[in-house]
Amino acid sequence: MTTGVAVMSSATAASTATATAAATARIPLFLSRNNSSATVCSTLRCRTITRTRTRARLAICCEVALKSDSSTGFDSSSSSPPEEDEELKKNLEKVGCKVKVKSPLKVYHVPKLPEVELTPDMVGVIKQYVGFWKGKYISPNYPFKVEYRIDVPDRGSVKLVVHLKEEEFEIIAE
């Protein structure tokens, strides 16, 4: 579909908008005027005419698709394989559990601290499993979001969030 843009005076633009609305009877068009601007909208296009002191400006608005094509994308009618559902359920049950890391890890992106080392004696809480997002299975490198609270000298308690693999932590008593 090709769309052209024409530059015209504000009076001509308003009369052309009403003529376009009358000429295309099969496409419902709506014309509204508010605060020195006229808007012509249809199911196929949306044009906004703005009047200024020197000239009229014609802007083309894009429409957003509300439904995806049924031949592509995620089909909600088909069910996922049972082993994926069991794995998802098993991983979602871990959310809220207290965990410890198995070996020391360095965390670099902590505000106002150069680096923090997580040791096996520190306890964190799993906040989220990110392997299932917006109805689709994804394969993140570090699927578990774990929150730690550490005491830093001269700053008090600092909350930091770390993404970990399942092999990097062990679950302790809930």
Swiss-Prot record:
Domain of life assignment: Eukaryota
Major location (coarse): plastid
Gene3D superfamilies given in the database record: 2.30.30.50
InterPro entries per UniProt: Elect_transpt_acc-like_dom_sf (IPR008990), Fd_thioredoxin_Rdtase_alpha (IPR004207), FTRV (IPR044166)
Localization terms from the record: Plastid, Chloroplast
Organism in which the protein naturally occurs: Spinacia oleracea
Presequence positions on this chain: 1-62
Region annotation Disordered: where it falls in the sequence: 69-89
GO annotation (BP), single: photosynthesis
SUPFAM superfamilies: Electron transport accessory proteins (SSF50090)
PANTHER family the record matches: FERREDOXIN-THIOREDOXIN REDUCTASE SUBUNIT A1, CHLOROPLASTIC, FERREDOXIN-THIOREDOXIN REDUCTASE, VARIABLE CHAIN
SUBUNIT field: Heterodimer of subunit A (variable subunit) and subunit B (catalytic subunit). Heterodimeric FTR forms a complex with ferredoxin and thioredoxin.
Upper classification of the organism: Eukaryota, Viridiplantae, Streptophyta, Embryophyta, Tracheophyta
GO cellular component: chloroplast
Gene Ontology molecular function, alphabetical: oxidoreductase activity
Family under the similarity heading: Belongs to the ferredoxin thioredoxin reductase alpha subunit family.
Pfam families: FeThRed_A
Function recorded in the entry: Variable subunit of the ferredoxin-thioredoxin reductase (FTR), which catalyzes the two-electron reduction of thioredoxins by the electrons provided by reduced ferredoxin.
Protein name: Ferredoxin-thioredoxin reductase, variable chain, chloroplastic
Biased composition (Low complexity): 69-81
Residue numbers bearing the Phosphoserine modification: 70-71
Assigned keywords, A-Z: Chloroplast, Oxidoreductase, Phosphoprotein, Plastid, Transit peptide
